[in-house]
Curated annotation (Swiss-Prot):
The gene is Rapgef3. Residues 369-388 are annotated as: Disordered. PANTHER family: GUANINE NUCLEOTIDE EXCHANGE FACTOR, RAP GUANINE NUCLEOTIDE EXCHANGE FACTOR 3. This is Rap guanine nucleotide exchange factor 3. The lineage of its organism: Eukaryota, Metazoa, Chordata, Craniata, Vertebrata. One of its GO terms (biological process) is positive regulation of potassium ion import across plasma membrane.
Length: 926
């Protein structure tokens, strides 16, 4: 007899087959869990390669109902009806992977003809295959952007998952070993060495490299906890860091979870995961897909999506399930924690927790950790240390001062503790409270001589004061650009300097230690540069000399700075006031009244280009720098609010700049944009991210103007792309402009300006641009492929994993995608309480500081390479007659000059009204 499925080869099955009653009547719709040896079905399954991305179904032919005549497989679908866009996209991705596998197979055969051959292992002959190690070696030798064995293993795992590669024994996990053999299915491909095929191979390897980490993570999760390697546990832990459901847990708990998580897939929508009233046995985290939460009497209560969790309450309270969970879509994946593991982790955490009390109240909560212990590595005896989990501000500061050591390295846990505290103290310990506490510690002396010796008592006091000075030096280094205009801070520093000058022993130690420390342990400031701190005098000199300016602070907006407030009237006349950047709306109205431009009863509102009006609260601060793109402030009588119209300048340009852009190459334009963006990015103080997420209502006398200016630039760039394309009326030049913007995005990515790269790509994906089908059709095939390759970095799945992996591979200087960093900060802030049992949740502060330090890493090289155009500015002679000998007009020459291009990229004029962009788009292509 023959067993087959449509479109594949037929295999002959011998007549000596014994039917077993155990599999004589399997149900249509799925394969049995256990198939006994010697049965027909068992033999078929052994011979058949079944990709994991497919489901399988038994099909009985009615001519012989007592025998299994055939077996067919059908792809998983995500809906009961017709395939939707998501299914089509998944199928297209599978097709791309199969095509990539064939291209790789062809190239490997052409480069290494003996790679695929018959192999004999343990007296068994395996036809036309290669070992896992040889396949990885071959992929690495090809280059093509693959630089490590783990990356090559990920590529092979993707091919294995999609059926483009198969194991000779149908194992699902790719292994980089000599004794594991794999083959490419299908006939041997014909050789082809054209240039187009090579480009397709590069594109194919980029696709496989992008999907490789996800495949390796899936394999790690599918393994039982006891089989996971250290590297796989680290990989799972990094995934948990970005999952919303566990954001409130400490890193030690996340590492414990990484060791016990179980992978649980379900293929069919409508499957009931558990029912209301069932006994709670597991906690679930949605890794892929969504579920409906249904209760008796209320029906559908809510829908949970990727990153959400459910089932924890029943475990904590040891109660029955409070709702029924039903799969909302096909192919859902869950991360499961069983009850016994959950309870063990909770007990372990409690056992490692130490609480310090004063006067009957808990003032500090510490957690015991082991230095050098990873998620799977056992603790090292004798190397335990305690990490602050929560506490009062004063106790956290006291513990920090006790833990500081003068000889600690940059990677010492105490240094990280100090950095976390300094970056986040404004959230829980304002400067005035910090100053008072530090002065108190400076004056406090032990009640009894330490060890009974007056000398040791004096040494203890001196060491403690040294630690205070070291903390203050680090604090000044971090915040020095913001402190010069702060009278409270300068008064505190003066008091501390006076106290130091009265202590002879401390002054002598400072004179000996600080010059050497400046050479070997230079302190970081808020912009990622270094600055000298304390000088060898009787008292510390906290700020750098004027001869040593901080280059990155030039042009930054500080708290005491005055900025222009452009106030519009209903008749569109404009009044400009210069007020402090942190001025409140009430103070702005008072300044207007002082200038006799405000009458009683008038209010301040902001109006955008679409005519939407939003009132400004009297206590709102920094409204001038927080305005959105093309927004203006209006002073108006309340009865005239609904009659306001946008200022003409808010509406944007009516003519495009395509002629000027034609004269500048995409690479030079990217260089100009990157240099301008770097200047804006370098002026952002690290702590502005924390202030921005907390909001001005939580913190006074701070500004986030530099960060808001950078964010406004992101919006400006994406609308600039859409504006220029919508204002280009001729199809040919419009297609050329579209091509230039795609190349611009590629150059921005190459220059590691990821923020502007995302802005340009978002502009190209604007609905007003994506609908211009005739314009996109004019693009060459190569440019369309380039755009498709760039789009992969925008993939938002699994919390933008593709972008995050790409970012980790880049060396500084880098301009990161700022909106995602702010999203992470908001995620941390809103997902974790600032107070836990009336104590500061310092674990939350630690997570926020870790996210903020990304800015310092990206700016650890303080200068960005100048763009080619800017580097030539100094060589341009204004009176050069030779430059005028050209067929171009003087206007064209001035347009293409570096100075004019530099001015253009700084003052982009855009249309940000989506309705207007859509109208222009419909006029171009109805």
């Amino acid at each position: 007899m023959k067993v087959s499925w449509p479109g594949e080869n037929h295999w002959q099955v011998g007549p000596a087959v014994v039917e077993s009653p155990a599999v004589g009547a399997p149900q249509v719709g799925g394969l049995p869990d256990v198939v006994p040896e010697g049965t027909l079905l068992n033999m078929v399954l052994k011979r058949m390669h079944r990709p994991r991305c497919c489901s399988y179904q038994l099909v009985f032919e009615h001519r012989r109902p007592s025998c299994i005549q055939g077996l067919r497989w059908t792809p998983l679908t995500n809906s009961e009806g017709s395939l939707d866009f998501r299914v089509s996209l998944e199928q297209a991705t599978t097709e791309h992977v199969h095509k990539a596998g064939k291209l790789l197979y062809r190239h490997l055969l052409a480069t290494y003809p003996t790679l695929i051959r018959d192999r004999k292992y343990h007296l068994r002959l395996h036809r036309q295959c290669c070992s896992g190690r040889e396949l990885v070696d071959g992929i690495l030798a090809l280059g093509l952007g693959v630089h490590s064995r783990s990356q090559a293993v990920g590529i092979c795992q993707v091919l294995l998952d999609e059926g483009a590669l198969c194991h000779v024994k149908h194992d699902w996990t790719f292994q980089d070993r000599d004794a594991q053999f794999y083959r490419f299915p299908g006939p041997e491909p014909q050789p082809a060495g054209t240039h187009d095929v090579e480009e397709e191979l590069v594109e194919a390897m980029a696709l496989l490299s992008q999907r490789g980490p996800d495949a390796l993570l899936t394999v790690a999760l599918r393994k039982s906890p006891g089989q996971r390697t250290d590297e796989e546990l680290d990989l799972i832990f990094e995934e948990l860091v970005h999952i919303k459901a566990v954001a409130h847990l400490s890193n030690s708990v996340k590492r414990e979870l990484a060791a016990v998580l179980l992978f649980e897939p379900h293929s069919k929508a409508g499957t009931v995961l558990f029912s209301q009233g069932d006994k709670g046995t597991s906690w679930y985290i949605i890794w892929k897909g969504s579920v409906n939460v249904v209760t008796r009497g209320k029906g559908l209560v809510t829908t949970l999506h990727e990153g959400d969790d459910f089932g924890q309450l029943a475990l904590v309270n040891d109660a029955p399930r409070a709702a029924t969970i039903i799969l909302r879509e096909n192919n859902c994946h869950f991360l499961r924690v069983d009850k016994q593991d959950f309870n063990r982790i909770i007990k372990d955490v409690e056992a490692k927790t130490m609480r310090l009390e004063e006067h009957g109240k808990v003032v500090l909560v510490l957690e015991r950790t082991s230095q050098g212990a990873g998620p799977s590595r056992p603790p090292t005896p004798g190397r335990n240390r305690y990490t602050v989990m929560s506490g009062t501000p004063e106790k956290i500061l006291e513990l920090l001062l006790e833990a500081m050591r003068p000889d600690s390295s940059a990677h010492d846990p105490t240094e990280t503790f100090l950095s976390d505290f300094l970056l986040t103290h404004s959230v829980f310990m304002p400067c005035t409270q910090l100053f008072a506490a530090l002065l108190h510690h400076f004056h406090v002396e032990p009640s009894e001589p330490a060890g009974g010796s007056e000398q040791e008592r004096s040494t203890y006091i001196c060491n403690k004061r040294q630690q205070i000075l070291r903390l203050v030096s680090r604090w000044v280094a971090l915040y020095s650009p913001m402190l010069r205009s702060d009278p409270v801070a300068t008064s505190f520093l003066q008091k501390l300097s006076d106290l130091v000058s009265r202590d002879t022993r401390l002054s002598n130690l400072l004179r000996e230690q600080y010059p050497e420390r400046r050479r070997h342990h230079r302190l970081e400031n808020g912009c990622g540069n270094v600055s000298p701190q304390t000088k060898a005098r009787n008292a510390p000199v906290w700020f750098p000399n004027h001869e040593e300016p901080l280059p990155s602070s030039a042009g930054a907006i500080r708290v005491g700075d005055k900025v222009p407030y452009d106030i519009c009237r209903p008749d569109h006349s404009v009044l400009t006031l210069h007020l402090p950047v942190t001025a409140s709306v009430r103070e702005v109205m008072a300044a207007l009244a002082h200038e006799d431009h405000w009458t009683k009863g008038q209010v301040l509102v902001k109006v955008n280009s679409a005519g939407d009006v939003v009132g400004l609260q009297p206590d709102a601060r920094g409204v001038a720098t927080s305005l959105g793109l093309n927004e203006r402030i209006f002073v108006v009588d309340p009865q005239e609010v609904h009659e306001l119209t946008p200022h003409p300048e808010q509406l944007g340009p009516t003519l495009g700049s395509s002629e000027m852009l034609d004269l500048v190459s995409a690479k030079d334009l990217a260089g100009q944009l990157t240099e301008h963006d770097w200047n804006l990015f370098n002026r952002i103080h690290q702590v502005e991210l924390i202030h921005y997420v907390l909001g001005p209502q939580h913190l006074r006398d701070v500004t986030t103007a530099n960060l808001e200016r950078f964010m406004r630039r992101f919006n400006e760039l994406q609308y600039w792309v859409a504006t220029e394309l919508c204002l280009c009326p001729v199809p040919g030049p419009r297609a050329q402009l579209l091509r230039k913007f795609i190349k611009l995005a590629a150059h921005l990515k190459e220059q590691k300006n990821l923020n502007s790269f995302f802005a340009v790509m978002f502009g190209l994906s604007n609905s007003a641009i994506s609908r211009l089908a005739h314009t996109w059709e004019r693009l060459p095939h190569k440019v369309r492929k380039l755009y498709s390759a760039l789009e992969r970095l925008l993939d938002p799945s699994w919390n933008h994993r593709v972008y995050r992996l790409a970012l980790t591979k880049l060396s500084p200087p880098v301009i990161p995608f700022m909106p995602l960093l702010l999203k992470d900060m908001t995620f941390i802030h809103e997902g974790n309480h600032t107070l836990v049992e009336n104590l500061i949740n310092f674990e939350k502060m630690r997570m926020m500081a870790r996210a903020v330090r990304m800015l310092h890493h990206c700016r650890s090289h303080s200068t960005a390479p100048l763009s080619p155009l800017r580097s030539r500015v100094s060589h341009i002679h204004e009176d050069s007659q030779a430059s005028r000998i050209s067929t171009c007009s003087e206007q064209s020459l001035s347009t293409r000059s570096p100075a004019s291009t530099w001015a253009y990229v700084q003052q982009l004029k855009v249309i940000d009204n989506q309705r207007e962009l859509s109208r222009l788009s419909r006029e171009l292509e109805p």
